[in-house]
């Protein structure tokens, strides 16, 4: 019985520590949901699935592991954001600014990149034909097939 209690206690402590290390900042999320502006925020692991994030400002924010599946990020500014291992499948990035983002390991399945600014972005796990990136700005943009330069100004 003592062993079970000890194991349960250790489980609770580990969950608390892991939760505080890996979870988003709840105040950042609350402010973002209210204003759609959150620069330098910690929204790591946040569930923003199907979110209406049109024209949101998330400059230099931590969105590592965030769930942005089917989110409307059209016109959003994600300059310098950490999108490592984020789920952006089926997201709308039409006209979004992803300049300098690190999206290593992110899921971009069926994403709309029309008019997106992808300059200096690390999308190294993005396995996509250049036709799907038609209309996007690619300058020193890293995708799975290598560094791309297209529509540079």
Please annotate each region the language model reported.
Residues 1-8:
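Positively charged n-region of N-terminal signal peptides that target proteins for export
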Residues 10-11, 21:
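Cleavable N-terminal signal peptides
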Residues 24-153:
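Tandem repeat scaffolds
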């Amino acid at each position: 019985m003592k062993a079970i209690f000890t194991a349960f206690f250790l489980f609770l402590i580990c969950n608390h520590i892991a939760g505080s290390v890996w979870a988003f900042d709840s105040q950042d999320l609350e402010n973002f949901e209210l204003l759609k502006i959150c620069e330098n925020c910690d929204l790591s692991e946040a569930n923003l699935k199907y979110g209406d994030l049109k024209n949101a400002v998330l400059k230099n924010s931590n969105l590592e592991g965030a769930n942005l599946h089917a989110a409307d990020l059209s016109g959003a500014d994600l300059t310098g954001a950490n999108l490592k291992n984020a789920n952006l499948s089926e997201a709308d990035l039409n006209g979004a600014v992803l300049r300098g983002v690190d999206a290593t390991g992110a899921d971009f399945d069926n994403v709309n990149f029309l008019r997106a600014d992808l300059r200096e972005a690390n999308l190294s796990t993005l396995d996509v034909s250049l036709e799907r990136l038609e209309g996007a700005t690619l300058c020193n943009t890293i995708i799975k097939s290598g560094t791309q330069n297209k529509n540079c100004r």
